[in-house]
């Protein structure tokens, strides 16, 4: 079974939940370490999504400029 791709918004919400749980200081050190690890993984995924989106936007902008120059 193929794993469903998580949306940017869902990953960001999970990261915010992790940060909130760590900020309130009511979780154990072990749980904090697990949460930190999961948070870092989410940060990396979110960063990749943003970089991919940035690349697509640059391509679209370049195409728009070329279309404008050729008209």
From Swiss-Prot:
One record GO biological process = DNA catabolic process
Task: List the record's Gene Ontology CC terms alphabetically.
Answer: cytosol; exodeoxyribonuclease VII complex
Protein family per UniProt: Belongs to the XseB family.
Q: Which UniProt keywords apply?
A: Cytoplasm, Exonuclease, Hydrolase, Nuclease
Q: Which Pfam family is one of this chain's hits?
A: Exonuc_VII_S
What EC class is this? hydrolase
- Subunit architecture: Heterooligomer composed of large and small subunits.
Functional description taken from the UniProt entry: Bidirectionally degrades single-stranded DNA into large acid-insoluble oligonucleotides, which are then degraded further into small acid-soluble oligonucleotides.
Its predominant location is cytoplasm
Where does this one sit in the cell?
Cytoplasm
State what protein this is by name. Answer: Exodeoxyribonuclease 7 small subunit
Which chemical reaction does it catalyze?
Exonucleolytic cleavage in either 5'- to 3'- or 3'- to 5'-direction to yield nucleoside 5'-phosphates
Q: Which GO terms describe its molecular function?
A: exodeoxyribonuclease VII activity
| InterPro entries xref list | Exonuc_VII_S, Exonuc_VII_ssu_sf
State the EC number(s): 3.1.11.6
